[in-house]
């Protein structure tokens, strides 16, 4: 008979990997911000470009990080529920 439900350990490992990926993306976002702000570029184009990074692109990446963390929590919660049902 095929298994129905979650492989709890597999779910927890997946959630951990998703959390790790979110952390790596968060660190990458910080490094990219340093790169974008770290070279000499003066003028209105520079201001607009850097403002676009801060207000749009960086914000999008930050939202992805939050979504990944939320999804990881969802998987962990599902694993906990599966464990309770299985016991």
Write out the residue ranges for each language-model feature.
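N-terminal secretion-targeting helices of virulence/extracellular proteins
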Residues: 1-87
